[in-house]
C-alpha cells in the first residue's frame, strides 16, 4: 500500500500567499482603470504662441485710431487637439483676438486641410473679442480712419498670424498623448445685460443692492485635461461677457487675459484657455479701470478654481464633429440710392462704408442677399456637447440651447468669423444696437438681418446635434 504524504506546511503557506496576491492584483485592476482607461480612450495635445504685435498695428474694436504704446501682458493664441480611441480628431483654437474675419480663417482652414488632413468640421477658431488686441485683415474695415500704411501693417501682421496658427495646430497634433478629460461648472456674476441696464446707473444699483435686469448667463463651464499620472495639463473655461473693460492703448487680454494669467500662475505648466460663450449683449460693468479688469479676471479665475476643488465628471470616450453654413438673409440689400444718401451721413463709419460699397457697384459687383453663417456641433463622449457659432451671438442663444440640450452643453459664440451681432428673435423685435440697423458697421451690404435669423440658426443647430449623437452609432 502506497503511503500518502501530508501536505507540507510551508508549501500550503506559499500557495495561500500566491492566492492572496492574485486576488489583490485583480482588485487593483478593478480600482485603477478610470485613469488607465481614460489614457487609452483620449489623447490630447497642446500648443500656444504669443500674438502680441511687434509693429504699430492699431488695436481693434473701437472706431478710432489706437496705436499700442506698451502692454500689460502678452496676448496669446492656443490650441487643444483631441483624438479619441477610434482615431477621430478635432482642434479647438482659442485666442485673444478681437475678431477673426472669414478672409483669414478660410486661409487657416485650407492650409490645415492640406497639411494635416483636418476637415472643416474638425477645427473651430474662436476669439475672445478682446478690444485691447490688434486688428486683423478686413475685419471691421470701415470702423477705422485707416491709411495705406496702416493697411499694409495689418496685412503683414495677418499673414504672420495665419502662418503661426497653422504651425501651432501642427504642434498640438504632434503633441497628442494619453489624457483624461473631465468637466464641471462654476459661477461668477460681473457680466451685466447692457441692453437692460444703463451703464451710468450700475454703480448706484450695485451699492443699493437692487437687482439688475435682463437675461444673463453667469455660468462658467470648465473642462480639464489631465495626464495619465494625474498631472493637470490644461483648463478650458468660458464666460458670456464682452472683454471691453478697457479702451486704452495698452495691449492686454482684458479680463479673460488676466484670468488666464492667474490660473497659469497658480498652476505652473498648465495651459489656460478661454472661450466667449455668447456675450454679445453682455458687458463687464462698471468698467474702464485696470483695477476693475484685474478684479473681473480674478473673479473668473476664482470661479474656475472652485470647480477644480470639487469632484469633476469624467468625459467618456467618443468624438464626433459636424459643421455647416446656414444662409442668413438680410432684411433688405442696400441700393445705390441708399448708399448715395449715406455718403452724407453724420456717422464717419457709415460714410466710409457707403463710399466703399459705391465703388463696388461702379465696378459691376452685385451684393449677396444672405451671408454664410458658420455653425459647429462637437460631441465629446455622452457627457459634453459643444456648439460653436460665428460672431457676436447674444446670450439668448446660450440660454436656449443649454435648456434644449441639457447639462454638459457649451454654447460658444465668436467662432470662425467676426460677421456682426447675431440677434435672437427677442432682440431683433426689440431693435437697438444688437438687433437693429447696424450691419453697415461690419461692412455688410445691408442694414439689418431678416426676422427669421434665430429660427434658421436653431434648425441648423438641431440638425447638427443629431448628426453627432454617439448613441445613434
Please identify what each model-predicted range represents.
Residues 32-38:
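Sec/Tat signal peptide C-region and signal peptidase I cleavage site
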Residues 18-32:
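Bacterial N-terminal signal peptides
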Residues 1-17:
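N-terminal secretory signal peptides that target proteins for export/translocation
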Residues 39-126, 130-271, 277-278, 288-298, ...:
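Conserved beta-alpha junction segments in alpha/beta enzyme cores
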Residues 282:
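Catalytic histidine-centered segment of alpha/beta-hydrolase-like enzymes
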Amino acid at each position: 500500500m502506497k503511503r500518502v504524504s501530508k501536505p507540507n506546511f510551508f508549501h500550503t503557506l506559499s500557495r495561500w500567499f500566491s492566492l492572496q496576491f492574485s486576488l489583490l492584483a485583480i482588485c487593483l485592476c478593478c480600482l485603477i482603470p478610470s485613469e488607465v482607461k481614460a489614457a487609452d480612450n483620449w489623447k490630447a495635445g497642446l500648443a500656444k504662441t504669443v500674438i502680441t504685435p511687434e509693429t504699430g498695428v492699431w488695436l481693434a474694436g473701437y472706431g478710432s485710431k489706437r496705436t499700442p504704446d506698451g502692454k500689460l501682458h502678452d496676448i496669446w493664441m492656443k490650441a487643444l487637439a483631441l483624438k479619441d480611441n477610434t482615431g477621430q480628431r478635432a482642434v479647438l483654437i482659442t485666442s485673444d483676438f478681437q475678431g477673426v474675419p472669414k478672409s483669414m480663417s478660410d486661409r487657416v482652414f485650407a492650409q490645415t486641410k492640406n497639411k494635416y488632413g483636418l476637415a472643416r468640421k474638425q477645427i473651430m477658431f474662436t476669439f475672445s473679442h478682446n478690444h485691447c488686441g490688434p486688428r486683423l485683415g478686413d475685419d471691421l474695415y470701415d470702423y477705422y480712419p485707416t491709411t495705406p500704411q496702416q493697411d499694409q501693417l495689418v496685412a503683414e501682421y495677418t499673414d504672420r498670424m495665419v502662418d503661426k496658427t497653422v504651425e501651432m495646430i501642427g504642434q498640438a497634433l504632434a503633441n497628442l498623448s494619453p489624457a483624461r478629460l473631465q468637466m464641471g461648472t462654476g459661477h461668477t456674476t460681473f457680466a451685466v445685460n447692457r441692453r437692460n441696464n444703463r451703464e451710468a446707473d450700475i454703480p448706484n444699483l450695485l451699492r443699493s443692492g437692487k437687482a439688475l435686469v435682463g437675461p444673463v448667463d453667469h455660468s462658467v463651464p470648465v473642462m480639464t485635461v489631465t495626464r495619465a499620472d494625474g498631472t493637470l495639463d490644461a483648463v478650458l473655461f468660458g464666460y458670456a461677457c464682452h472683454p471691453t473693460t478697457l479702451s486704452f492703448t495698452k495691449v492686454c487680454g482684458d479680463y479673460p487675459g488676466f484670468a488666464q494669467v492667474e490660473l497659469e500662475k497658480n498652476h505652473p505648466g498648465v495651459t489656460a484657455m478661454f472661450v466667449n460663450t455668447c456675450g454679445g449683449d453682455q458687458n463687464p460693468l462698471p468698467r474702464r479701470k485696470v483695477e476693475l479688469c484685474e478684479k473681473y479676471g480674478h473673479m473668473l479665475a476664482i470661479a474656475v478654481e472652485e470647480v477644480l476643488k470639487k469632484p469633476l465628471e469624467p468625459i467618456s470616450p467618443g468624438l464626433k464633429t459636424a459643421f455647416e453654413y446656414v444662409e442668413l438673409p438680410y432684411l433688405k440689400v442696400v441700393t445705390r440710392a441708399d448708399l448715395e444718401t449715406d455718403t452724407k451721413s453724420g456717422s464717419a463709419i457709415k460714410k466710409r462704408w457707403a463710399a466703399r460699397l459705391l465703388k463696388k457697384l461702379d465696378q459691376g459687383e452685385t451684393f449677396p442677399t444672405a451671408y454664410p453663417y458658420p455653425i459647429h456641433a462637437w460631441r465629446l463622449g455622452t457627457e459634453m456637447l459643444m456648439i460653436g457659432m460665428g460672431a457676436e451671438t447674444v446670450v439668448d442663444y446660450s440660454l436656449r440651447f443649454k435648456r434644449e440640450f441639457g447639462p454638459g452643453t457649451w454654447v460658444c459664440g465668436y467662432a470662425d468669423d467676426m460677421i456682426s451681432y447675431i440677434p435672437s428673435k427677442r432682440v431683433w423685435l426689440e431693435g437697438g444696437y444688437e438687433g437693429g440697423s447696424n450691419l453697415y458697421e461690419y461692412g455688410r451690404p445691408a442694414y439689418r438681418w431678416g426676422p427669421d435669423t434665430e429660427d434658421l440658426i436653431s434648425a441648423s443647430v438641431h440638425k447638427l446635434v443629431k448628426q453627432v449623437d454617439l448613441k445613434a452609432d
